[in-house]
Amino acid sequence: VITVVGHADLTAQTLKLLETELSDRLRCLAQPGSMVLVRAGCGLPVAAGRAARRARLPLVVVLPSQDAVPALLPGRDQAAAGELLFLAAHVRLLPYDPADRDACASADERLVYSSSRLLAVWDGSPAHDQDATADVIASAHGRRIATETLWAPGYARHSRSPSSDEPS
């Protein structure tokens, strides 16, 4: 299983570029029986799902659950989840709160622990209250899970304003 995680605030241009790069990397890394695993959400998970389809690899989508029933995703992630479910060969339920950053980071770590390889889209920045990508990568390294980070010239994230750290 190849898990794909990364920044949630990638620009549209970066996501387009990533679809191609991820597809190429997935083709190179794929072994017989390989699958691609993502946590449902907008942005990178959709790019990874499309890349898995291009690479002809089955996609496993993880949805949040409460009491073994799928939980409602935040509004911006709902349409993306629909596309991911269309692309998915398998769906897994995982108990976590999709509106809680720490719960999402913990869910990502559980995905990584169940995989043989991590593909992380990461610009090298430290973790902060809106992004735990660095922590997930450190956790994978601690578990000796093969990890590859992707960040090419031209990739960008949306600018963070000082008020973006405040809950909405």
Question: Which sequence ranges carry the predicted segments?
Answer:
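Acidic/glycine-enriched connector segments
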Residues: V1-P167
